[in-house]
Protein backbone atom coordinates (compact mmCIF):
# COMPACT_ATOMS: atom_id res chain seq x y z
CA UNK A 1 0.00 0.00 0.00
CA UNK A 2 1.47 3.35 -1.07
CA UNK A 3 1.43 6.25 1.40
CA UNK A 4 -0.52 8.83 -0.59
CA UNK A 5 -0.26 11.47 2.15
CA UNK A 6 3.56 11.64 2.14
CA UNK A 7 3.44 11.81 5.93
CA UNK A 8 6.71 11.12 7.73
CA UNK A 9 7.89 10.79 11.30
CA UNK A 10 7.93 14.20 13.08
CA UNK A 11 5.53 15.81 10.59
CA UNK A 12 2.81 18.08 11.97
CA UNK A 13 -0.69 16.94 11.09
CA UNK A 14 -4.21 18.26 11.65
CA UNK A 15 -6.99 15.95 12.80
CA UNK A 16 -9.88 15.72 10.33
CA UNK A 17 -12.42 14.16 12.72
CA UNK A 18 -13.06 14.32 16.44
CA UNK A 19 -12.29 11.36 18.69
CA UNK A 20 -14.24 12.09 21.90
CA UNK A 21 -12.91 9.00 23.72
CA UNK A 22 -9.37 10.38 23.34
CA UNK A 23 -10.39 14.01 24.02
CA UNK A 24 -9.10 15.28 20.68
CA UNK A 25 -11.20 17.30 18.28
CA UNK A 26 -11.28 18.02 14.60
CA UNK A 27 -8.71 20.73 13.90
CA UNK A 28 -6.30 19.71 16.69
CA UNK A 29 -2.68 19.66 15.58
CA UNK A 30 -0.45 16.72 16.45
CA UNK A 31 3.00 15.34 15.70
CA UNK A 32 3.68 12.00 14.04
CA UNK A 33 5.88 10.04 16.45
CA UNK A 34 5.89 6.75 14.53
CA UNK A 35 4.92 5.38 11.13
CA UNK A 36 3.74 1.80 11.71
CA UNK A 37 3.15 0.95 8.05
CA UNK A 38 2.10 2.94 5.03
CA UNK A 39 -0.85 5.11 5.97
CA UNK A 40 -0.95 4.15 9.70
CA UNK A 41 0.50 6.69 12.14
CA UNK A 42 1.07 7.09 15.86
CA UNK A 43 0.28 10.73 16.62
CA UNK A 44 0.87 12.70 19.80
CA UNK A 45 -1.42 15.58 20.71
CA UNK A 46 -0.31 17.97 23.45
CA UNK A 47 -2.03 20.62 25.55
CA UNK A 48 -1.05 24.29 25.80
CA UNK A 49 1.61 23.39 28.41
CA UNK A 50 3.26 20.79 26.18
CA UNK A 51 1.91 17.82 28.15
CA UNK A 52 0.68 14.82 26.20
CA UNK A 53 -3.11 14.75 26.15
CA UNK A 54 -3.49 11.87 23.68
CA UNK A 55 -1.38 9.34 21.83
CA UNK A 56 -3.43 7.69 19.11
CA UNK A 57 -2.91 5.39 16.15
CA UNK A 58 -4.76 6.67 13.10
CA UNK A 59 -5.09 5.98 9.39
CA UNK A 60 -3.95 8.66 6.99
CA UNK A 61 -7.57 9.37 6.05
CA UNK A 62 -8.10 10.88 9.53
CA UNK A 63 -5.27 13.43 9.29
CA UNK A 64 -3.75 15.90 6.87
CA UNK A 65 -0.08 16.88 6.81
CA UNK A 66 0.59 20.53 7.52
CA UNK A 67 3.06 22.38 5.34
CA UNK A 68 4.70 24.69 7.82
CA UNK A 69 7.20 26.91 6.06
CA UNK A 70 8.73 28.86 8.88
CA UNK A 71 11.26 31.37 7.66
CA UNK A 72 14.27 32.03 9.84
CA UNK A 73 14.67 35.62 10.90
CA UNK A 74 17.98 37.28 11.59
Model-derived segments and their meaning:
Residues 2-3, 9-74:
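Basic/aromatic-rich interaction segments and small domains that mediate binding to polyanionic partners
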